[in-house]
Amino acid sequence: MAAGTLYTYPENWRAFKALIAAQYSGAQVRVLSAPPHFHFGQTNRTPEFLRKFPAGKVPAFEGDDGFCVFESNAIAYYVSNEELRGSTPEAAAQVVQWVSFADSDIVPPASTWVFPTLGIMHHNKQATENAKEEVRRILGLLDAHLKTRTFLVGERVTLADITVVCTLLWLYKQVLEPSFRQAFPNTNRWFLTCINQPQFRAVLGEVKLCEKMAQFDAKKFAESQPKKDTPRKEKGSREEKLKPQAERKEGKEEKKAAAPAPEEELDECEQALAAEPKAKDPFAHLPKSTFVLDEFKRKYSNEDTLSVALPYFWDHFDKDGWSLWYSEYRFPEELTQTFMSCNLITGMFQRLDKLRKNAFASVILFGTNNSSSISGVWDFRGQELAFPLSPDWQVDYESYTWRKLDPGSEETQTLVREYFCWEGAFQHVGKAFNQGKIFK
């Protein structure tokens, strides 16, 4: 029987999979999710942690015998028993099928729809509507499968049920209001059956289903961003002007003493995003630019793209300090399933994480399964491609063709508008918009 420690951050739905599986199998799993034992964004970046888990990702599991494994599905499998994994080769294959389905088909649209309502991702109306329809399709697929079944595989709970329930959890809690979910009675029955099992309740507690579909809250999104010092300082400076000089001085001293407070207000995920390691700035050799990228990103995240963010972009764009580029994936014939194509974009963005302060991009997947393409518009600091400035940034860029754009041309104006808004004819592509991702 497995026994060990699970490193994660609080309320991580991916960690729930292993914890529920352990409730069924009897595996002894200790959870470290809060300081001083585990500080997400700090502990998982230490040399000691990275020696055990090179990716630095959580959840991560360390067995009492020294065995280490990361990735939530692998951990859940490890702490499970034969019954959860599938007691026959056929059942085991079906369990893997549903676990894979959850990651490939449910996670992308669920994230696109739910994350903006939680204030952790930019909202795009068209993308959200597409995600809603995809979720509707998925719930319908599950509903048909569960019409004559109590559980996804066999007659008892397996890892298939645990994984799919955890993947659907935030949908049911945040956006699947009664009028939306009522069309899927079999899926609802199965979901409620699972979450009310003692083993699920021991981990999830009482799950309250959504009563009213949550909407994107621009204020919540702005507050959730790690870069929020500037607005606070501006607000503070306006308030300071209204105070007498002596009182302002006293207030400044109090603020200095309370310097750590803003970081304490961030949740664990935000602290990880904010905790960038100190390194030499590859763009330090460039002259100062009048274009403030962070301000544009705030406009893009919190205001209407077409009427506010785009006019701001062109009004403030510094053509000497920044450059625009069009990229296109070189090997469209290798693109098969759209979720896999989307993962190419996500993976590239993750590997370019330290470039975010000096770049912005909208990359779009066009088309359908086995007939798709990837292209995007990028805004880089400087006049050359940024990738050669750091070996960390050179993994993916050679898989794309790059063409520098003329900021003053009509073609560039159209490309920027269509790619930043995720709306338009996209005549140069010849395929319909599927989904997009923003690098910011």
Swiss-Prot record:
Q: Name one GO cellular component term.
A: cytoplasm
Keyword Acetylation belongs to the record: yes
What InterPro entries does this protein map onto?
EF-GSTs, EF1B_G_C, EF1B_G_C_sf, Glutathione-S-Trfase_C-like, Glutathione-S-Trfase_C_sf, Glutathione_S-Trfase, Glutathione_S-Trfase_N, GST_C
| Sequence ranges assigned to domain EF-1-gamma C-terminal in this UniProt record | 279-440
Example GO BP: translational elongation
| Positions of region (Disordered) | 221-267
Q: Which residues carry this modification: N-acetylalanine?
A: 2
In this chain the GST C-terminal domain maps to: 88-216
In chain numbering, cross-link Glycyl lysine isopeptide (Lys-Gly) (interchain with G-Cter in SUMO1) is at 256
Please give one Pfam family short name.
GST_N
Residue ranges occupied by any GST N-terminal domain in the UniProt entry: 2-87
Transmembrane regions listed in the UniProt entry: none
- The cross-link Glycyl lysine isopeptide (Lys-Gly) (interchain with G-Cter in SUMO2) sits at 288
Q: Keywords assigned by UniProt?
A: Acetylation, Elongation factor, Isopeptide bond, Protein biosynthesis, Ubl conjugation
Question: Which residues in this protein are found as N6-acetyllysine?
Answer: 147, 212, 404, 437
Whether Acetylation counts among this entry's keywords is yes
Concerning PANTHER family, the annotation shows: ELONGATION FACTOR 1-GAMMA (PTHR43986:SF13)
- How does it associate, per the subunit comment? EF-1 is composed of four subunits: alpha, beta, delta, and gamma.
Question: What does the UniProt function comment say about this protein?
Answer: Probably plays a role in anchoring the complex to other cellular components.
Name of the protein described by the UniProt record: Elongation factor 1-gamma
- Origin species, per record, is Bos taurus (Bovine)
